[in-house]
């Protein structure tokens, strides 16, 4: 905990920027929810908070279990923490989804701390929101199975496009500076698992793009399978 507090002090300006972006995403979600989301589930405020907190806690625990992928360098690892968050957004709307995403990352920081000066944690939040927001907004606009599938497909596309660009433009250069290595060294790590990776753009194409597609597909599929079943348990749906 002391290391986390010290890291927060050293990166105060960055954390304030992250907070501003988080607030902006919550406001954006609230606007979309007000304009587009009809027939949302009514739930007492206390129960809503408890429900979001419960799913965020599950997501934070899932975030601790990371799976390396054969086609990507070792610093890209899959976790399934977006599943509870996407479920939360489908049950309660985009605002609850973004808040759940934020609480998930905060809980993970309390459980495990940060090894990336909060950069990786911020990236997880922002990239996760690019899946959660489009999927939940489109679903709540119509609340049908078809729109749920379309929303998750749109969210996967948005996450893949944004995540790939974000890695190329910001994350990879930032990590190179942070760890005192060159971008060429990062590319070389990718080349060890895939000889087709010879540049940053090819690293993104052959590692980041399939990583995000796979994560989006798995998250969407599990959410689709669990949504009604858990809904009956939590909301006594028939």
PLM region spans:
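Loop-helix junctions at membrane interfaces
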Residues: 1-238
């Amino acid at each position: 905990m002391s290391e986390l507090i010290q890291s927060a002090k050293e990166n105060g300006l960055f954390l304030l920027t992250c907070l501003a972006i988080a607030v902006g995403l919550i406001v954006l979600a609230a606007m979309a929810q007000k304009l587009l989301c009809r027939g949302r589930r009514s739930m007492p405020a206390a129960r809503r908070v408890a429900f979001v907190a419960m799913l965020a806690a599950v997501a934070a625990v899932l975030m601790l279990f990371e799976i390396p992928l054969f086609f990507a360098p070792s610093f890209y690892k899959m976790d399934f923490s977006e599943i509870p968050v996407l479920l939360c957004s489908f049950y309660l709307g985009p605002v609850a989804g973004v808040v759940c995403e934020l609480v998930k990352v905060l809980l993970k920081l309390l459980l495990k701390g940060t090894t990336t000066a909060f950069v990786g944690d911020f990236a997880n939040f922002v990239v996760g929101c690019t899946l959660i927001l489009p999927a939940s907004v489109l679903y709540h606009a119509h609340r049908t199975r078809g729109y749920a599938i379309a929303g998750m497909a749109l969210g996967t596309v948005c996450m893949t496009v944004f995540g790939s660009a974000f890695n190329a433009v910001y994350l990879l250069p930032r990590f190179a500076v942070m760890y005192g290595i060159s971008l060429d060294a990062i590319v070389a790590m990718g080349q060890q698992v895939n000889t087709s990776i010879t540049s940053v753009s090819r690293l993104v194409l052959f590692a980041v793009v399939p990583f995000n597609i796979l994560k989006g597909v798995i998250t969407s599929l599990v959410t689709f399978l669990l949504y009604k079943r858990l809904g009956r348990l939590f909301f006594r749906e028939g």
